[in-house]
C-alpha cells in the first residue's frame, strides 16, 4: 500500500480508538484485506455484555483483567461473523490521556494472536513514543512477528 492508504487506515484506527471508554489509554485497530477493503474494526474495551462502570474502569487491576485489546477485538469481531483474516493487514494506533499518539509492535499476547489469525502485516505509528512500561513486551512482540514472517512497519 502507499503511504496515503496507510495514513487513511491509521486514521480509521484512531477513530476506532475514540470508542474506548478506558480513561487512560484508547487503542483502535482496523483489519484491511488485500484489495483495501475494511474487514473489521476494534478498540480496547470490556467484553460484550460486561458493564463499563466507572468503578471497573478506574480500578487498574480489575480493568486490566477485563480489557480486550483492540487487536484481539478486531480478530474476534471478524471470527464472530465469519470474516477471513488470513493475508490481511492490521493497522493499530493508540492515544493516552495526554493526547499523545503512539504505536510500536502490539503486545506479545496480541502478536501471537495476529500470527495465529494469519494476518500478513502490521502497521502502526512509531514505537519511540510508546509508554515505557510496555517497551520490553513490545520489543519481544516484534521478535515474535519477525520469526513468524509477519511484516511490520511503522509509519512516521
Predicted regions and their residues:
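Short, basic/aromatic recognition patches
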Residues: 1-25
Amino acid at each position: 500500500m502507499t503511504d496515503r492508504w496507510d495514513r487513511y487506515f491509521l486514521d480509521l484506527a484512531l477513530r476506532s480508538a475514540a470508542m474506548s471508554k478506558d480513561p487512560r489509554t484508547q487503542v483502535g485497530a482496523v483489519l484491511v484485506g488485500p484489495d483495501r477493503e475494511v474487514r473489521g474494526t476494534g478498540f480496547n474495551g470490556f467484553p460484550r455484555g460486561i458493564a463499563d462502570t466507572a468503578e471497573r474502569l478506574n480500578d487498574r487491576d480489575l480493568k486490566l483483567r477485563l480489557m480486550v485489546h483492540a487487536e484481539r477485538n478486531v480478530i474476534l469481531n471478524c471470527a464472530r461473523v465469519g470474516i477471513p483474516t488470513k493475508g490481511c493487514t492490521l493497522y493499530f494506533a493508540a492515544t493516552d490521556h495526554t493526547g499523545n499518539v503512539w504505536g510500536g509492535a502490539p503486545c506479545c499476547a496480541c502478536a501471537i494472536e495476529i500470527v495465529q489469525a494469519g494476518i500478513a502485516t502490521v502497521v502502526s505509528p512509531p514505537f519511540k513514543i510508546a509508554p515505557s512500561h510496555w517497551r520490553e513486551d513490545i520489543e519481544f512482540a516484534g521478535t515474535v512477528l519477525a520469526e513468524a514472517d509477519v511484516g511490520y512497519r511503522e509509519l512516521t
